[in-house]
Amino acid sequence: ALAVFPNTNPVLDNKGALDSLKFRSADKMVEFFPIASLTVGTEGMDISEMADLKEAGAVAFSDGKKSIQHAGVIKRAFRYTSTMDSMIVNHPNDKTLSETGIMNESAESAFMGMKGIPGLAEEISLHRDLQLCEYNDAKLLSHMGSGYI
C-alpha cells in the first residue's frame, strides 16, 4: 500500500482528481491511498473542499513538501479535520528562517559553501503546528528532515 502526496498532475485537490487516481491505479498490484491537498493547488492559501475529498476517499490532508506558512490557514484546517476523523500531514518549515537554504545547516554545509537551513526553521514551525493541533483536538503527522529535535 502507498499513501500518495497531493503534489501530482493534476493536484489532488478535488473529487475528480481523486477519482482519476483511483481509476488509474485500480489494476495495479499496490493499493493507493490518496492524501488530498490541504489547500487549493497546494498553494497554502485557501483550504480545499476537505469534506468532499474525505468522502471521495482521502485518508489525510497535506500540501506535500510545501509547508503551510499561514497559521490561520492551518488552524482552520485542523478545526475541519478534527470534525471528520482525519489528519494533517505537514512538513514544518518556517520559510522566514530557511529562506533559500538547500541543505541542513552544519559544518559540512559551511565547508561546501552551501547555504544551510537551520534546524530551528523546523522546530519553530513544528511547535506552532503542535499548539494549533492541540487547540483544535486534531491529529498531525509531521515529516521532518533536520533531525534537530
List where the protein language model places each region.
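Metal-associated gating/positioning segment near the N- to mid-region
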Residues: 1-26
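Short acidic, glycine/proline-enriched helix-loop-strand junctions
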Residues: 14-16, 30-31, 81-86
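A glycine-rich helix N-cap at a beta->alpha junction
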Residues: 23-38
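Short histidine/acidic/glycine/proline-rich micro-motifs that form metal-
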Residues: 7-11, 38-41, 67
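Short beta-strands and strand-loop turn motifs
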Residues: 1-6, 32-36, 59-63, 110-113
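Histidine/acidic residue-rich metal-binding segments in metalloenzymes
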Residues: 45-149
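Acidic (Asp/Glu)-rich catalytic clusters
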Residues: 21-27, 50-55
